[in-house]
């Protein structure tokens, strides 16, 4: 069980901030491993999401500290913090209204695979468009564009879409540089993952057990470490590459899942 927890934490850490859908990978990996029952897995995912979120906080601790200090100081710069808050609201509202229905209908391997493929095609389309940069850094992002990125994040309620993918590609469409779109996606992930984890923790508090501390701790640590590494690797990668490689990965992986499901080669649950 601890080894499976390590694998799940690794998957969350690597995929949370890449445009390839952490939720989709967790659904597929959890089903393949037969990892925990549904309620226990929901609780477990709270802890690995927190691990990934804290990796962003640690990587950008100086930037976050500077941003918060500027926001509370009289006459200080509040634009970035306000932008994050405004961008967070649409997905928070949509999640409260529709997450239960979406989970009941779409949280299965086939729907995830289809979303993988569709998302990959959208990324390829976005990369083929002429990309005119109007916003070089996250500090230059207008509140109007922040809201638009937040609306894009609502698409991530569909498993397999990717929260990072929706916000980064949405940012590119709005004229953000690759670095600005990626970093704003990172920052937006802090309240999004934090709120989702808190909501799930309250909802599933009765499923918490001291017997699971070891399993949860392994997943949390693995998620933190690999998310930290993935964040740094992605920032280096996008300085010289497009997101097309992630698109082709999504398409190929989605086709493999559909093929193994259709052929019966892999007995996907759900």
From Swiss-Prot:
Spans through the membrane:
79-99, 105-125, 155-175, 182-202, 215-235, 242-262
Q: What else is known?
A: Bacitracin is thought to be involved in the inhibition of peptidoglycan synthesis by sequestering undecaprenyl diphosphate, thereby reducing the pool of lipid carrier available.
Q: Report the sequence similarity comment from the record.
A: Belongs to the UppP family.
Q: Which PANTHER family match?
A: UNDECAPRENYL-DIPHOSPHATASE
Name the UniProt record assigns to this protein: Undecaprenyl-diphosphatase 1
GO annotation, biological process: cell wall organization; peptidoglycan biosynthetic process; regulation of cell shape; response to antibiotic
The principal localisation class reads membrane
Q: What is its EC number?
A: 3.6.1.27
Pfam (any one): BacA
- Any idea what job this protein has? Catalyzes the dephosphorylation of undecaprenyl diphosphate (UPP). Confers resistance to bacitracin.
Q: Which NCBIfam families match?
A: PRK00281.1-2, PRK00281.1-4, undec_PP_bacA
The protein's matches in InterPro entries, at most eight in alphabetical order, are given as: UppP (IPR003824)
Q: Where in the cell is it found?
A: Cell inner membrane
Show the catalytic activity: di-trans,octa-cis-undecaprenyl diphosphate + H2O = di-trans,octa-cis-undecaprenyl phosphate + phosphate + H(+)
Q: Which HAMAP family match?
A: Undec_diphosphatase (MF_01006)
Give the record's GO CC terms.
Answer: plasma membrane
Instruction: Identify the enzyme class.
Output: hydrolase
Please provide the record's keywords in A-Z order.
Antibiotic resistance, Cell inner membrane, Cell membrane, Cell shape, Cell wall biogenesis/degradation, Hydrolase, Membrane, Peptidoglycan synthesis, Transmembrane, Transmembrane helix
**Entry's Gene Ontology molecular function annotations:** undecaprenyl-diphosphatase activity
Q: How does it sit in the membrane?
A: Multi-pass membrane protein
